[in-house]
C-alpha cells in the first residue's frame, strides 16, 4: 500500500507574518534599533510615538554601548560677529584620528578671530560616542 504524501500548504498569512516589528517587546526592539546607524534615527522617529520615545531613551544608547555599535561625532557652534548669525551642526562621517581625554568644559571653549576679524567663532568641541 502506498503512503500518501502530505501536501504542505502555506497560507498567505502565516504565523511569522502576523508579528509586526512595531509590536515587538521593547527590549527586543531596542536591540534592533541599536544596530541601525544613527543616520536613520530621524526617519525612524516618524514611524510612531513609541519609536520616537525609544530612539530618545537612554536605554537605547546604553544598548548601543554594550553592543559596541556607538558612533563618534563632533558637535560645533559658531557665531558671526557682524550679523549675529549662528551656525551649529554635527560632523558624523569622518575618521576619528585622535580622541581627546575628558577635560574641563571651560577649556573646551575657545575664541578665534580670523585675519579679517569679521568672524568670531566660538567652538564647543565635544567628542563622545553616542
UniProtKB/Swiss-Prot annotation:
SMART domains according to UniProt: FBOX
InterPro entries hit by this protein: F-box-like_dom_sf, F-box/kelch-repeat_ARATH, F-box_dom
Domain F-box: 18-64
Matching SUPFAM superfamilies: F-box domain (SSF81383)
Protein name in UniProt: Putative F-box protein At1g77880
Organism name: Arabidopsis thaliana (Mouse-ear cress)
Amino acid at each position: 500500500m502506498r503512503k500518501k504524501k502530505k501536501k504542505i500548504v502555506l497560507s498567505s498569512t502565516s504565523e511569522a507574518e502576523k508579528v509586526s516589528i512595531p509590536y515587538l517587546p521593547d527590549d527586543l526592539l531596542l536591540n534592533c534599533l541599536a544596530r541601525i546607524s544613527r543616520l536613520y534615527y530621524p526617519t525612524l522617529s516618524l514611524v510612531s510615538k513609541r519609536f520616537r520615545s525609544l530612539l530618545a531613551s537612554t536605554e537605547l544608547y546604553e544598548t548601543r554601548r554594550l553592543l559596541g555599535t556607538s558612533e563618534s561625532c563632533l558637535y560645533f557652534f559658531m557665531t558671526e560677529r557682524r550679523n549675529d548669525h549662528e551656525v551649529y551642526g554635527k560632523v558624523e562621517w569622518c575618521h576619528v584620528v585622535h580622541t581627546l581625554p575628558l577635560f574641563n568644559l571651560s577649556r573646551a571653549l575657545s575664541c578665534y578671530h580670523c585675519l579679517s576679524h569679521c568672524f568670531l567663532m566660538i567652538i564647543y568641541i565635544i567628542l563622545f560616542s553616542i
